[in-house]
Amino acid sequence: METIHVDLAERSYPISIGAELFCNPAHFSSVIPAKKRVVVISNVTVAPLYAQQIIDTLNTFECQVSLLELDDGEQYKNLDTFNQILTFLLEENHSRDVTIVALGGGVVGDVVGFASACYQRGVDFIQVPTTLLSQVDSSVGGKTAINHPLGKNMVGAFYQPKAVIIDINCLKTLPEREFAAGMAEVIKYGIIIDSDFFDWLDENMEKLYALDHDALVYAISRCCQIKADVVAKDEKESGVRALLNLGHTFGHAIEAEMGYGNWLHGEAVSAGTVMAAVTAQKEGLISQQEVDRICALLKKAKLPLKAPKEMTVEAFMKHMMRDKKVLSGKLRLVLPTSIGSSEVVTGVSERVLADVIEQCKA
């Protein structure tokens, strides 16, 4: 097992990564006092697989546990689900000392985290991510949010969990399409910060898809360590943390325009990463050879390289100008400058963006 610490002074917390963690009371009792009231919030897909394991473990130190099951899908990461959680907590008369366990993928983690931030001005919560994407990205760093019809993650808060518990055995029940979507975020870390990790992924992709224990623990740990280091330097995304959004400006536009859930987040990020790399090449920031290597690794990970053919330049620009990185009306893009480095760039012309969009459509 690996343990990584997110260093945020009094709000620091551990990330535990390994197998069979749900059955080990130590991972929960270290952050949940005995006899505590706990609410496990999951979805209708994940709860039947893993909720009872966690409830049984919590019962070993006499916690009073209740379970809420949400609908499954990006389309439910909305105000209605947020309100459903708050109503459940109120109807059960939970006070500020309740602990909430977010058991599921990125949607569950985001909406449950946001509800935890808001309920009685903030209650403790633990992230228990069950998809590769949530294990390597969304569960770490305290970003919580719900979607708005006009934009993804537009309503939310920075609110850190008390712990992140990552059991790689969950990946055995994850559909391959969802696993591939998570690989988009894994590959992102290699592109923006760590060229050695990029090379390692290129050499070990088959092991990852075979769910090799050591390969998974290493890849997830490396991603979490990179993100923990970045978050410790820039929790509220005023600087270096923005680099973690490689591919997301284009990708969020795809998700919003095509309808949440039709493209998985990682699929949209993959296509968006290609668009960012092509933009960087047109701006003279990266070589065509490195763009080709990025595309080849995404393809090896069974990810889409092209944006939807039905999306117009106007549709892309409409959504991209609502991106949270826009400042003073100017679009800022995270662009790779080589494999292993990246920067935030302002001032890419609409003509270049239009060329990129047309070039990168299916």
Curated annotation (Swiss-Prot):
Purpose: Catalyzes the conversion of 3-deoxy-D-arabino-heptulosonate 7-phosphate (DAHP) to dehydroquinate (DHQ).
Q: Enumerate the catalysed reactions.
A: 7-phospho-2-dehydro-3-deoxy-D-arabino-heptonate = 3-dehydroquinate + phosphate
Protein EC? 4.2.3.4
Q: Which UniProt keywords apply?
A: Amino-acid biosynthesis, Aromatic amino acid biosynthesis, Cobalt, Cytoplasm, Lyase, Metal-binding, NAD, Nucleotide-binding, Zinc
List positions binding Zn(2+): 185, 248, 265
CDD domains of this UniProt entry?
A: DHQS (cd08195)
Cofactor(s) listed: Co(2+); Zn(2+); NAD(+)
Q: In which pathway does it act?
A: Metabolic intermediate biosynthesis; chorismate biosynthesis; chorismate from D-erythrose 4-phosphate and phosphoenolpyruvate: step 2/7
Q: Where is the protein situated, by its record's location annotation?
A: Cytoplasm
GO CC terms = cytoplasm
* MF (Gene Ontology): 3-dehydroquinate synthase activity; metal ion binding; nucleotide binding
Which is a GO BP term held by this UniProt record?
Answer: chorismate biosynthetic process
Top EC category: lyase
Residues folding into a coiled coil are none
**The organism sits in which domain of life?**
Bacteria
**Protein name per Swiss-Prot or TrEMBL:** 3-dehydroquinate synthase
